[in-house]
Amino acid sequence: MSKQVVIVGGGVIGLLTALNLAADVDQVVVCDQGEVGRESSWAGGGIVSPLYPWRYSPAVTALAHWSQDFYPQLGERLFASTGIDPQVHTTGLYWLDLDDETEALAWAAREQRPLSAVDISAAYDAVPVLGPGYRHALSLAGVANL
């Protein structure tokens, strides 16, 4: 008996579900109202880091950490199996002139994340188009994007 699966929704969740099921079933069909992979996941499917992670619950933090550590491996797997480069780029992330900088640094120490205060010139060097007037910067190394 042949195993067939139909997945409704061609966003990041539907496509990853199809990818993982493909090894165990005979046929996977993905249906979407528009072009597969081009709806909301096209814009937001690569965002796995809350913009201000220290402001979120431990559950969101745990999920974000796992996802951030997993995405580079997933990108390599997708490229190897499809030949399509998902363009995972590790760029890091800067926050400028935060009101809750102390809380951010405490969160990073508690969660063992590589967030640190850096001289504002480092942010200006890394992001030359940054407008003038910023005085303080935090940098989180290792943040990737798609």
Walk through the language-model features, giving the residues of each:
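Glycine-rich FAD pyrophosphate-binding loop
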Residues: A22-G44
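Fold-independent oxyanion-binding glycine-rich loops
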Residues: Q33, L51, G142-V143
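FAD-binding beta-loop-beta segment adjacent to the flavin cofactor pocket
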Residues: V36-G37, D125-L130
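Dinucleotide-binding Rossmann-like beta1-alpha1 core, especially the glycine-rich loop
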Residues: I47-A126
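Conserved redox-cofactor binding core of oxidoreductases
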Residues: G92-T102, V129-L146
